[in-house]
Amino acid sequence: MSASVSPLAPKYYPAMPVIHGVRIATAAAGIKYKGRTDLMLMVFDRPAEAAGVFTRSLCPSAPVDFCRRNLVHGKARAVVVNSGNANAFTGLKGREATQATAEAAAKAIGCATTDIFLASTGVIGEPLDAGKFSHLLGDMAESATEDFWTEAAKAIMTTDTYPKVATETVLLGQVPVTINGIAKGAGMIAPDMATMLSFVVTDAPIKADALQSLLSKGVGSTFNSVTVDSDTSTSDTLMLFATGTAAERGAPEITDAADKRLADFKKALGRVLKSLALQVVRDGEGARKMVEVEVTGAKSAASAKKIALSIANSPLVKTAVAGEDANWGRVVMAVGKAGEPADRDRLAIWFGDIRVAHQGERDPAYSEDATSAYMEGEDIRIRVDLSIGRGKATVWTCDLTKEYVAINGDYRS
C-alpha cells in the first residue's frame, strides 16, 4: 500500500449496504506488510451460487488453479484472500499452501474444501506460509459481520493507494436487490479475462449458470477494457456470488441469463464492474492522469479494440500524457503498429474536443497552445476515427510516470 493517496482517488466512497447471507472479516497476519490488515474472509451462511473468470496467463497461480477446479460445482461457502504474496510459481509448496488454507477455512465454516475459493496477490515466486494466517480463520468466521465491505477492500490492497468499492440497487421482479463489489489492483493490469482481484456479491436469486453468463459478458466492456502497464497478472480473479436471500422478499428465481426480468440487473452489474475497473485504472501505480481512448470507424469492433489497446499500452503515448505533451504523432505511431486495417489518409485524431490531425496530416486549425492547455487536466480523452468501417471500442488507461518506475523498482525491498 502506498504512503500517499492517488490524486485520482474518488472524492467520496459510497455507503455499502448490507447483503444478507454474506459476512466479512479481516485480520493482520503479517504476511508481508506491518501494521495493516492483509487477510480477508468472506463467509456465506448458506451455499451461494458462484461464477468466475480468471487470468489466461500460462503461468497461473496456485489459487487460480484451485478456484477453477472448485467453480465446476457452482457453489461457495467462503472466500479467503491474502495480500503480500501471490503464491504463484511456487510449485508443490504453493499447492500445499492452498490446500492447507482451504482445509482451515472449511473447518472454520463447517463445509467441504470444494466450497472454498482462494485468491492471493503480491510478490510472485516466494512460497506462501499458510501457517501465518490459517489459524486465524476460525475466529474470523465467528466475528465476521455484514457491514465490512470497505475494510475488506483495504485488506486485499498491495500497492493500491485507496480501497475500491462499488454498489448498486435495482429492482428484480419489483423487489429491490443489491450488488456490492470490491477490487484491488494498481500494477500488472492488462486483464484478458478479469482484473487482478475483484469480488462481487448480490442477494438476487440467480443460478450459477446464468450468473456465469452474466459475468462473462459483463467483463468485455469493463475489466477487459482497462490497462495500466500491459502486463497480465498470474493471479487475475473476478468472482460473482449470489446469496439468493432476496427470494425471501419475493424476488423471482432466475435460471437463464436471457430472462427479460434481468434487463435492469444486467445494466446495474455493468455499472458496478465498470466502476471497479475504472477505479483500478485511476489508482495505477504512480498515475496522475486518467486516459480514455476511443476508436471509431474501424473495420470491426475487435479491430477497434486492438487499435485502442495499442494506443493505451504505448509507453510513448503514456509518457507524453504524463509530460502534458500534445504529441499526437505518437498516437499515429500506435495506430500504425497495431496490425489492423487503417488508411493513413482517412485518419483523424482528437485530444478532447480539439481535432489535431485530419486526412493524413496535421489539422489546419491545430493550436499547440489550446491542446497543451487541455493536456494539463486530470482526465484526458483521445479519440481516433479511422473512417473505414463501423467498428468502435473504448478502453481506459493512465499515464506512465517516474513514480511507476520507483514503485516497481523498489517493490520487493
Swiss-Prot record:
The protein's annotated pathway: Amino-acid biosynthesis; L-arginine biosynthesis; L-ornithine and N-acetyl-L-glutamate from L-glutamate and N(2)-acetyl-L-ornithine (cyclic): step 1/1; Amino-acid biosynthesis; L-arginine biosynthesis; N(2)-acetyl-L-ornithine from L-glutamate: step 1/4
Subunit structure: Heterotetramer of two alpha and two beta chains.
Sites marked Cleavage: A194, T195
GO cellular component: cytoplasm
Substrates-to-products reaction catalysed: N(2)-acetyl-L-ornithine + L-glutamate = N-acetyl-L-glutamate + L-ornithine; L-glutamate + acetyl-CoA = N-acetyl-L-glutamate + CoA + H(+)
Site (Involved in the stabilization of negative charge on the oxyanion by the formation of the oxyanion hole) residue list: T121, G122
Organism: Brucella melitensis biotype 1 (strain ATCC 23456 / CCUG 17765 / NCTC 10094 / 16M)
Record keyword Repressor present: no
InterPro entries: Arg_biosynth_ArgJ (IPR002813), ArgJ-like_dom_sf (IPR016117), ArgJ_beta_C (IPR042195)
Name the UniProt record assigns to this protein: Arginine biosynthesis bifunctional protein ArgJ
Active site: residue positions: T195
Localization terms from the record: Cytoplasm
The keyword Amino-acid biosynthesis appears for this protein: yes
Enzyme class, UniProt record, top EC level: transferase
NCBIfam families: ArgJ (TIGR00120), PRK05388.1 (NF003802)
Key words of the record: Acyltransferase, Amino-acid biosynthesis, Arginine biosynthesis, Autocatalytic cleavage, Cytoplasm, Multifunctional enzyme, Transferase
EC number: 2.3.1.35, 2.3.1.1
Protein family according to the UniProt entry: Belongs to the ArgJ family.
Function statement: Catalyzes two activities which are involved in the cyclic version of arginine biosynthesis: the synthesis of N-acetylglutamate from glutamate and acetyl-CoA as the acetyl donor, and of ornithine by transacetylation between N(2)-acetylornithine and glutamate.
Sequence positions that bind substrate: T158, K184, T195, E285, N408, S413
Domain of life: Bacteria
MF GO annotations: glutamate N-acetyltransferase activity; L-glutamate N-acetyltransferase activity
Any one GO biological process: ornithine biosynthetic process
